[in-house]
Amino acid sequence: MPAFKKNIIVELVKGARAYLKVDAGITHRAREELKERPVRDAGSEAGGIRPENIVWIFGSGRSGSTWLSSMMGDIEGHSLWGEPWVGALFGNYYYRGVHERKHSAAHFIMGRHRDAWIGSIRNFILDGARAIFPAFPEGGYLIIKEPNGSIGAPLMMEALPESRMVLLARDPRDVVASSMDARSEGGWNYKNNKSMYLEGRKKSSSDNPDAFAEGRAKRYLEGMGKAKEAYDAHRGRKVLIKYEELRANTLGTMKRMYSTLGVPVNEEELARVVEKHSWENIPENKKGEGKFYRKASPGGWREDLTPEQAEAVERVTAPLLRELYPEKVG
């Protein structure tokens, strides 16, 4: 089996297990229960979770999604679903695991009969949400932080067209610089996953920094590109938030975001969560090079990337740079 296909299969299995929180196969009793279970209409609600009260956060890793989602999750009546990887589960398979010609094939499970399998994705998400949040408050909002599943953003938004979407953007040069620091031999990601790096299942940025920078730029283009595609196609409530604007005027940007999304929020409470999660309130021993909270300084890539690395990132991500940051393109 080709290495690429093998890696895709491994990712899909890991994603499914992580999403469903199971390690064993389905039992005979469970199979019988599933047979007896009535088929639920794809548009019905899951417990107290209303599809129109779901807010997705798509974009890229290292773009401030943890910060943004933490603030949103602290608002009364909001619940945070942190990285279910459901976008990665379906997106990796649909866009990377099979040839595009399969998408219109009559017998392919995610082929010609689109309404059927899109409806199944819808039920899959809502059933998962109901299982994970059994006591979800009536009228509450579910915030789904899914930057690393952005490759599946078009499928997620098609399955739940009533839901709302935040497209969180950050200069790809800063994203790559942050990723390189995290995956260097002294970085937090390396320390947390050291065995995977030593076994070769993850690549350290210290091994070949130039190749790593270009590779991360390609991943940014793929994931952020799909997130932008979903954003452009979505006909419901949506908002583009730039990390740089969030840093410069956090409270003002949060107010604009909630207003555009049509989500009511108490301004005093919003000010409280903004202050609570501010960069200044993060303990100093948790900030700095090699740590999860590194710089929070837009434009810091100028100090972190070599001219060659910056050029490579700009070349690879040029389509998105021109569209999202036209003022930064020479």
Q: How should each PLM-predicted stretch be described?
A:
Residues P2-D127:
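PAPS-dependent sulfotransferase catalytic core
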Residues H78, V263-V265, P326:
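Helix N-cap/coil-helix junction residues
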Residues D304-G330:
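C-terminal accessory extensions appended to soluble enzyme cores
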